[in-house]
Amino acid sequence: MNSNYVPLTSSVDVEEKMESENGVDLGNDIDLEKGLPLKYNSENESGLPSNSASSYLINPDPTMDLEAQTFNHNESTTSVGHDNSNSPPKCRKTCSSNKVYSNEVPLLFVFVISISIVCIFDLVIFGCLQYNMVSMDDLHVMQRLSWFCASLALLFILMRYYDFWTKACKDGIKHIFKKWKNTPLAFLQVLIFNIIGFFVRKGLKDSFGEQWGLKTSLFAHVSFATMSIFIFIFETLKPGSCSVDWIARILKAVVYFLEDSDEL
């Protein structure tokens, strides 16, 4: 009768047998001269022993903690219900607010609009000159040159900042239409302002003669037209910005100036 006998061997006996056959030291024996093997410190790797088998036995999977920490960090930084994979990268964002003139509008169209506004500006100045019976021959060379340079500067500004001023005009017109109830009061204040300006200019002409009036007529017409437009816009957008107190102060200043001129 044959019996299958299997000897009972422990894991320690198997390791000792493998050492004796292969001549490999698994690092389980303690060297009395060197002492105990250094303990592996995960925070400071200076204590890592040279034997890789010992480090494997102390910390079987050193990447386990790193993966867990990385997963926890990503989970904490990711908001609930938000998928970062669908969000576009920040580097793709382009800031178009710094653009002054975009290529969406043809350059020829921008030039035509700008030159039309410059022509209107020149026609207003020419009309003021004709109103005061001043022809182009009466202007000096420097006056003509300054007029030409001012027209070129206006053309350059209108073309360079086309997107800016067109958007501002559109928003302003929309806002004025929303405030259409304030337009009658704005027209009334503009009318009062021009009446006061007329009497002021008439008083200055009477005090200093026609020569003073002819010299300042162009400036007076342009300045009063510009100020009238600004007063209308301010009063339409914000009623009371050019209030009665402001007009009263101007009247007091004009009366005080006329009294001083009469004394002289």
Swiss-Prot record:
Q: For this UniProt record, give its keywords in alphabetical order, as a comma-separated list.
A: Meiosis, Membrane, Transmembrane, Transmembrane helix
Pull one GO CC term from this UniProt entry: membrane
Keyword Membrane listed? The answer is yes
Cellular compartments annotated: Membrane
Annotated knockout phenotype: Normal vegetative cell population growth. Simultaneous knockout of wtf15, wtf14 and wtf7 results in normal spore viability.
Which residue intervals make up region (Disordered)? 1-26
Superkingdom per UniProt: Eukaryota
Identify its membrane topology class. Multi-pass membrane protein
Q: Return one Gene Ontology term, BP aspect.
A: meiotic cell cycle
Q: Look up keyword Transmembrane helix and say if it applies.
A: yes
> Per the record, a Pfam family?
WTF
Tell me where the transmembrane regions lie.
107-127, 145-165, 180-200, 217-237
Q: Where is the composition biased (Polar residues)?
A: 1-12
The record, for PROSITE patterns, names:
ER_TARGET
Q: Which InterPro entries does the UniProt record give?
A: WTF
Q: What does this protein do?
A: May act in meiotic drive.
Family label: Belongs to the WTF family.
Any further remark recorded for this protein: Although the gene is capable of encoding two isoforms, RNA sequencing data show no evidence of alternative transcripts.
Q: Under what name is this protein listed?
A: Wtf element wtf11
Q: Which organism is it from?
A: Schizosaccharomyces pombe (strain 972 / ATCC 24843) (Fission yeast)
Gene transcribed to yield this protein: wtf11
